């Protein structure tokens, strides 16, 4: 059941808690899933964002994304990698969440996994396209200029996109979706208590 808290205090408190958890999950665990691209790491910071999406609403999930991104920038800044990688991550997460909200506006009507196939495929596909486009036009040129890491020269664009970016984001999107749905199901009792 989609839940909107009855008070502003509840809403603000939950957004703060989810943002803090999401920030923590940006730092640990970080899992490389493509052997040839260990610099591309999966994290689970999306899960609290999805909780905010379905416990509260879309705008709440955007607040969680914004706050955890600012926390990362302020408290765990790694220099150039953060300045260049964080915007890419932000846009990919926004794409995933937006498509998820459009294709699966509430959980009540998508109670079984068969009904979740379209949202899974759609959100994963769109976030992958966004990741490819942002990497191509923004991240790669900026990394070459500011981090002295020319991907086209050291890895090759074909190898980078087909062998790294494409499979990484497809796997990441599937894992994000499946883990988020499992967690949402597991914490349903907390959801009811939060609303009571």
From Swiss-Prot:
Q: What does this protein do?
A: Probable riboflavin-binding protein that interacts with the energy-coupling factor (ECF) ABC-transporter complex. Unlike classic ABC transporters this ECF transporter provides the energy necessary to transport a number of different substrates. The substrates themselves are bound by transmembrane, not extracytoplasmic soluble proteins and transport it into cells.
Database matches in PANTHER family: RIBOFLAVIN TRANSPORTER RIBU
Recorded name of the encoding gene: ribU
Free-text comment on this protein's domains from its UniProt entry: Riboflavin is stacked with one or more Trp residues in the binding pocket of RibU.
Could you name the Gene Ontology cellular component terms for this entry? plasma membrane
InterPro entries in the cross-refs: ECF_trnsprt_substrate-spec, RibU
Which parts of the chain span the membrane according to its record?
14-34, 46-66, 80-100, 120-140, 164-184
Subunit structure comment from the entry: In E.coli forms a stable energy-coupling factor (ECF) transporter complex probably composed of a membrane-embedded substrate-binding protein (S component), 2 ATP-binding proteins (A components) and 2 transmembrane proteins (T component). May be able to interact with more than 1 S component at a time.
Q: In its UniProt entry, what is this protein called?
A: Riboflavin transporter RibU
Q: Which UniProt keywords apply?
A: Cell membrane, Membrane, Transmembrane, Transmembrane helix, Transport
Q: Which family does it belong to?
A: Belongs to the prokaryotic riboflavin transporter (P-RFT) (TC 2.A.87) family.
